[in-house]
Amino acid sequence: MATEVKAIAKYVRTSPQKVRRILDQIRGKSYKEAVMLLSVMPYKACSIILKIVDSAAANAQVTKGFNKNKLIISKTFVDKGPTLKRFRPRAQGRGYKILKPTCHITVQVQDQSL
């Protein structure tokens, strides 16, 4: 049985759809390859996901003694968080509803040698 270590970021102020398109590209890749991909992608969510991947690698190194260079991204998923609701004043006393989505991002890594 492979030991997996995870890192979770909750209430991230971005839409789950925008995060999911990035997570689909790094799932199954090695740690080094995922970091390289995230550093060159032009999306805002890449910097957030890069921090989570680094945190998962650090968790694996500290808690299980794994080598960062031998880690693979085994599972990644994003869940919808609560939506922040705001109102924008409009003409004639109206207000338009502005929805600001949040999400919870989970990244799991495991040692390649196991």
From Swiss-Prot:
* GO MF terms, alphabetically ordered: rRNA binding; structural constituent of ribosome
One Gene Ontology BP term is: translation
Coarse class of the primary localization is plastid
Localization terms from the record: Plastid, Cyanelle
Record's keyword terms, sorted: Cyanelle, Plastid, Ribonucleoprotein, Ribosomal protein, RNA-binding, rRNA-binding
The cross-references to SUPFAM superfamilies, in alphabetical order and at most eight, read:
Ribosomal protein L22 (SSF54843)
For this record, an example GO cellular component is: cyanelle
Keyword Ribosomal protein assigned to the entry: answer is yes
Self-association and partners: Part of the 50S ribosomal subunit.
Q: Which NCBIfam families match?
A: rplV_bact (TIGR01044)
Provide the function of this protein. Answer: This protein binds specifically to 23S rRNA. The globular domain of the protein is located near the polypeptide exit tunnel on the outside of the subunit, while an extended beta-hairpin is found that lines the wall of the exit tunnel in the center of the 70S ribosome.
What family does the database annotate? Belongs to the universal ribosomal protein uL22 family.
- Record protein name field: Large ribosomal subunit protein uL22c
Q: Gene for this protein?
A: rpl22
